[in-house]
Amino acid sequence: MAGCSDGDRDLPRGYRHLEVPQAVLSSPAARTRGRALFLEHCALCHGERGDGHGQRSEGLTRPPRDFTSVDWRRSTSPRHVFFAIREGLLGTPMPQWKSLSEQDAWNLTAYVLSLAEHE
């Protein structure tokens, strides 16, 4: 799946055609590792459930993304989530996590995308 979907056109060139590891996205082991990373790096802002209600969320200039939202899940792509993890989001409190390996960034992506599956 090397081509870019229409929803990925707004990503920087290096991310538009990024190979999405579908096996990782559907892997229970990847999601388990992603959950551990989420609790370590993301839960303070996004909340342990990923609903955007973390301990630090109230003091932020913009509310954290609610990853449990089915509407959000339908409007995003794995490349967008991976990009946000690696590069942060300009104009928001979302920091870069370039210190994560590419594999762990995909593991975290897999977990984040799974949060809206049970809504």
Briefly describe each language-model feature range.
Residues 73-86:
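Short Fe-S-cluster ligation motifs
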Residues 8-37:
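Electrostatic cytochrome c docking/interface patches
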